[in-house]
């Protein structure tokens, strides 16, 4: 599968939460047509990252990780680095950053999209 095909499919079925997400989706669609290397972080104009919101089994707690570089708490995430399956990217980042081994995605598409 074309590495950007899944992202294009997500964008076509994604329902924006608000006007800003709608505008961001339009910009991302445009960039997908114009930029060949959106999966690589060396694209300084724009590139894809993926993150995950990790819940406990009862869904009443969320995992936050302390980011030493930025000196702040955040959810897990990272750069696509050439990988077009952003769910896989998000899952890989959670495992690397948290040490969790067993993960079960609740959704197979994005919760939010932003630039």
Language model: regions and residue ranges:
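Non-transmembrane, interaction-prone alpha-helical and coil segments associated with secretion
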Residues: 2-6
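Generic signal for short, ordered secondary-structure residues
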Residues: 7, 31-32, 38, 73, ...
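Acidic, metal-coordinating catalytic segment for phosphate/diphosphate chemistry
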Residues: 13-51
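Charge-rich, low-complexity amphipathic helices
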Residues: 29, 50, 74-75, 112
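Acidic pyrophosphate-coordinating catalytic loop
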Residues: 42, 111-115
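Conserved Nudix-box catalytic region and its N-terminal flanking loop in Nudix hydrolases
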Residues: 58-103, 107-111
